[in-house]
Amino acid sequence: MKSVLILALVFLLMLFSGCGARQTDESKVIDMTHSFDEQTIYWPTAQPFHWEKEAWGQSAGGYWYSAGRYSASEHGGTHLDSPIHFGEGKSTIDQIPLSRLMGPAVVIDITAACASAPDYQLTAADITAWEQAHGEIPAGAIVLVKTGWSKFWPDRKRYLGSDVPGDTANLHFPGLSREAAEFLAKKREIDGLGIDTASMDPGSSMDFIAHQILNGANIYGLENVANLEQLPAKGATLLALPMKIKGGTGGPVRIIAFLP
């Protein structure tokens, strides 16, 4: 199944690169990535994103030249959590096979529950309800949890629950429950888990149990995912390509969805 999907994705990319494709097919490609700038949300204890110009203008030789430098923690903005982030001995970001960075997108919508409960946790019942409507989650899928939280981006106070640097005691946003993480890790064969909040775990978590379970099963995470409201519950194909940092525990990722 996964090999067929990869071939289909290659075919799609060939179509999109063809003559005239931009006029007819670009509406079927969704960018699931928040831009990186000084407002990009990072974990309260992490070094935020910083970019500055090194050169910008006409060179001594009379031609235009521009260059910049950036710095940041691995974990912030739209990024990928490598399994080694919370899974000892598991894959670093450069060790994740390319075949696992693409797959069918499964979008589980819990926006209604999260609207009235900021600390809501995805349950196993939410997952099985999705399956009753759409069929069992296929092997190699990338499960995306839609909480509706991206509407608060980049307002740190509303998105995280606190805009105080270093404050991890007063965070409030949705995430996964232990039972949901265990269900996906043990009863399904997913490659990745994405969410439109700052963490796979809810903001109130102190032990990051969803990270422990999923990363421990060599499942990577995608956090601060954008534009989930533009994807159907099933049928889209996701491509998530992170910066290839040797030995990295995570890094910025460009996520693209191809609509059916």
Language-model segment annotations:
Residues 7-15:
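Bacterial N-terminal signal peptides
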Residues 20-260:
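Active-/binding-site microenvironments in catalytic and ligand-binding cores
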Residues 1-4:
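Positively charged n-region of N-terminal signal peptides that target proteins for export
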